[in-house]
Amino acid sequence: MSEMDEQQRLDILYQYEILDTPREHAFERIAALAKLIFDVPVVLISLIDENRQWFKSAIGFDTPETPRDHAFCNETIRSDEVLVISNAEQDLRTAKNPLVTGEPFIRFYAGAPLITPEQARLGS
């Protein structure tokens, strides 16, 4: 895949007009299924805009968004591959993240990029 610049990615994200919309049953079902399959306490469907990570669906995490620089998803959207961080305390990308060093003390992360037909990675 050729690299898409950040402005192109954001333009495509905004065209979907999904940011800050209410929760939707379809997304909630996907998150619930992921929680069941992977037996994890937290499942998020997130989108990354210029400054934040916004959650279209969230199970086990009550915050509607986080700053982009705290988003593990920010790493996920850099590749077409699934990102797995086995120990967030020891991974250089996440060890100093406030979500690792403080509440909710994230230790494990797995995320798959959400990729549009235009090959824009919008979130995870």
Segments from the language model and where they lie:
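Helix-loop-beta substructure at the N-terminus of cytosolic sensory domains
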Residues: 20-53, 68
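Signal-transmission linkers at sensory-effector interfaces
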Residues: 1-24
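Short coil/loop residues immediately preceding or within conserved phosphate-binding loops
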Residues: 40, 109, 122
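Sensory beta-strand/linker motifs that couple input domains to effectors
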Residues: 118-124
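Regulatory sensory and allosteric helical modules in signal-transduction proteins
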Residues: 11, 41-42, 48-58, 63-107
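A short, aliphatic-rich beta-strand micro-motif
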Residues: 107-118
